Amino acid sequence: MAAVSVYERPVGGFSFDNCRRNAVLEADFAKKGYKLPTARKTGTTIAGVVYKDGIVLGADTRATEGMVVADKNCSKIHFISPNIYCCGAGTAADTDMTTQLISSNLELHSLSTGRLPRVVTANRMLKQMLFRYQGYIGAALVLGGVDVTGPHLYSIYPHGSTDKLPYVTMGSGSLAAMAVFEDKFRPDMEEEEAKKLVSEAIAAGIFNDLGSGSNIDLCVISKSKLDFLRPYSVPNKKGTRFGRYRCEKGTNAVLTEKVTTLEIEVLEETVQTMDTS
């Protein structure tokens, strides 16, 4: 054998090996004048949960351009098929085009097989496409739906890795949303319970992350119905103005005034038509 793998008994506690490795790499790069790439913030909170009869997906509605709010009411819950929807975080153009492409391919697959597509099929299509581009398509997705095998919920990362869990969160506000899920989630919840839980999780992301904000959208998918609730709630209502804040003309005194005359040179031009006959 060229190499021998020695089994080590696992020890309790968090392992800081990767932290030490990153510190060594950062110091080595600094000597050569390079900087390690920083994590890219997606500026969104999206989440999903499995309840007794189906799936509840949720998202905020703020779209950002750096530190500027570009859109206060954008829709981040995308149609994949009549029984499957997908929340998108990351680059808005990438999430829109990726979900449209997969929705189109899934419709062709459905017409070919003559049945409603399965959620695992959509998951496989998405992960294969994203893995092919090695993370350069900035689409972090939460895929949920109900098919003949029951409700399914997946989180899909931009590099193509996926998780199948009873509750998932993605985006820059995902840590706050996950804290709510880990505290209040329980199996086999009723629909209203699940909607309230997802709403609280998205609200936690909105109030604890600058990249998330505005309203909360929900999508409820079950075998018997599909409810798209936009908006489900508005946690950030604009305050009412109680007075006028515009000063009347003449309120501030003019301290200095200077009038400068402009020298204008007037040129006269004549235009003659050319005879083309």
Curated annotation (Swiss-Prot):
One Gene Ontology MF term: threonine-type endopeptidase activity
Protein name per its UniProtKB record: Proteasome subunit beta type-7
A Pfam family: Proteasome
Enzyme Commission number: 3.4.25.1
Cellular component terms per the entry's GO annotation: cytoplasm; cytosol; nucleus; proteasome core complex; proteasome core complex, beta-subunit complex
GO BP terms, alphabetized: proteolysis involved in protein catabolic process
Domain of life: Eukaryota
Subcellular location: Cytoplasm; Nucleus
Reported function: Component of the 20S core proteasome complex involved in the proteolytic degradation of most intracellular proteins. This complex plays numerous essential roles within the cell by associating with different regulatory particles. Associated with two 19S regulatory particles, forms the 26S proteasome and thus participates in the ATP-dependent degradation of ubiquitinated proteins.
Source species: Bos taurus (Bovine)
Similarity comment text for this entry: Belongs to the peptidase T1B family.
CDD domains the UniProt entry points to: proteasome_beta_type_7
Entry keyword annotation includes DNA repair: no
Designated gene of the protein: PSMB7
Keyword Nucleus: yes
